[in-house]
């Protein structure tokens, strides 16, 4: 089948790594792909305007699940957290300084890189809104995060209701 440039790049990189091992082990004499060049096809990032974020925050949603997905998306917008880091976020990761500022201290799951994020009032409000909320993996979790696919589908529907034509996902 056909695959995109980024997928082709990732598969080529994997194959190149295997071939390096093959040369090192003496299974082949030389690396056949040394001169082969391939680059991923980077897509430009999509950003929401302040007005679009406000529309998402203001829209009346009938169902609890829709409101929760919208709120988690807004939280990610104001913190920059990736889906998996949102899913893994627990109350233990939230620290209040002596001056009253709140921060998230944790490590990115994808890279293991430590991070700390100062929480703006909107993010703090969302954390409090979901304290004691049913449907979480366990009570230590901050948000009732479900699978990524259903979150993406739901946020796309909400964006459509708001008249936002940008292709939203948990990556934005």
PLM regions with names:
Residues 2-14, 24-83, 87, 133, ...:
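Basic, Lys/Arg- and aromatic-enriched nucleic-acid-binding interface segment
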Residues 23, 131, 159:
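Conserved hydrophobic residues forming the short capping helix/wall of the S-adenosyl-L-methionine
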Residues 42, 109-128, 136-157, 163, ...:
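C-terminal catalytic core of Y-nucleophile DNA break-rejoin enzymes
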